Amino acid sequence: MSRIGKQPVSIPSGVECSIKGQLLSVKGKKGQMTLDLHPFTKITSEDGFLKLNPVVEDRDHWAICGTMRALVHNMVVGVTQGFEKKLLLMGVGYRAQAQGQKLTLVLGFSHPVEYAVPQGITIETPTPTEIIVKGFDKQLVGEVAAKIRAYRPPEPYKGKGVRYAGEYVMIKEAKKK
């Protein structure tokens, strides 16, 4: 069984945490996030640490407590450092261009695909075949990267498509006569 829920979350300098009942608010240099904690958990702030405990000492309550602790830790890391995901475009003529809050993708369709970037996310294209998704909300960064990848996921025969940096695509062998 994981013991993540028993570890406290350290609050670095420059981060403000406020607890109002089951609502936790974290504010840092990158932004502000709020989390509605599960009723099975109670949170306390002690000398630079946030400590989560279950309401009842039970296996299920500790499991929820571990999940909540991971979400709180991601909030603290997000408002201090932020998160980023890198995507690569593989294929002849595949390219991307970021213009403000809009991402234009040319992925071999008859038309360019336009993606409206949500609030709190910034997208950079250092090269036409590279996309970097940045933000302070880990869930939102992952969701945006997954939506961009879903436009043209890597196909198994040539590996063409949008893939995460470091993702291994299993290449199948072509059918033999």
Curated annotation (Swiss-Prot):
Q: Which PROSITE patterns match?
A: RIBOSOMAL_L6_1
A GO CC term attached to the entry = cytosolic large ribosomal subunit
Q: Name one GO molecular function term.
A: rRNA binding
Spell out the InterPro entries in the cross-references: Ribosomal_uL6-like (IPR000702), Ribosomal_uL6-like_a/b-dom_sf (IPR036789), Ribosomal_uL6_a/b-dom (IPR020040), Ribosomal_uL6_bac-type (IPR019906), Ribosomal_uL6_CS (IPR002358)
In terms of superkingdom, the source organism counts as Bacteria
Keyword Magnesium in annotation: no
Pfam families listed in its UniProt record:
Ribosomal_L6 (PF00347)
Keyword check for Ribonucleoprotein: yes
Question: Which keywords does UniProt give here?
Answer: Ribonucleoprotein, Ribosomal protein, RNA-binding, rRNA-binding
GO BP of this protein: cytoplasmic translation
Give the family per the record: Belongs to the universal ribosomal protein uL6 family.
Q: So what does this one do?
A: This protein binds to the 23S rRNA, and is important in its secondary structure. It is located near the subunit interface in the base of the L7/L12 stalk, and near the tRNA binding site of the peptidyltransferase center.
Description of how the protein assembles with itself and partners? Part of the 50S ribosomal subunit.
Checking PANTHER family in the record gives: 60S/50S RIBOSOMAL PROTEIN L6/L9, LARGE RIBOSOMAL SUBUNIT PROTEIN UL6M
Q: What is this protein called?
A: Large ribosomal subunit protein uL6
